[in-house]
Amino acid sequence: KTGKVGTFGGVQLPTVTIFMDGFADGVARYNKDKGANVQLIGWDKASQKGLFAETFEDKAKGTQIAEQLIQQGADVIMPVAGPVGLGAAAAAKNHAGTKIVGVDSDWYQSAPEYKDIVLTSVQKGIARAVYDTIKAGADGKFDKKPYVGTLKNGGVSLAPFHDFEGSLPAGLTGELDAIKKEIVEGKTVVTSKSAFDAKGGSGK
């Protein structure tokens, strides 16, 4: 609603910044499709510079950074910082209208104390990754290439909107499904300097 969203990381590592790159791409796609001008605070994909707590453990740091983002006008925050992200959720809960986008797992379920402010979550499909790896071994197809989770193989996904389903703009879920289809079919190519391809190389 404010026209500003925010993100921050725990430590500047590829496994963190790849989430932040994706969030930046999502904002850019929304602006393009909707003719909007939503501003992302806390991360610049082009320069790879942004906000970091420099810890994955100190929840107070998460609260501090989230407060900073909120004061700058962000009303949706995606903390990519492990337990530090829960500190951000605590800050968001104290500001009416501020929402959190969880990471790694569905925070609506894994952090139920904050479910009333969890808009959605970007999930890692750990169970699917384990299944695929074991199956590859059983089929004699296991190799040393790193497992890369994608929308196509179920290694990553967007969690349900849960309690916010009824208040979403009309047609939004259909638009998201269409974008997912574009990515899976290769019509929309998603890149990140933090990514690794299936051959073990670095991303673009």
Task: Cite the ranges covered by each PLM segment.
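A residue-level marker of the well-folded mature domains of exported/periplasmic proteins
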Residues: 1-204
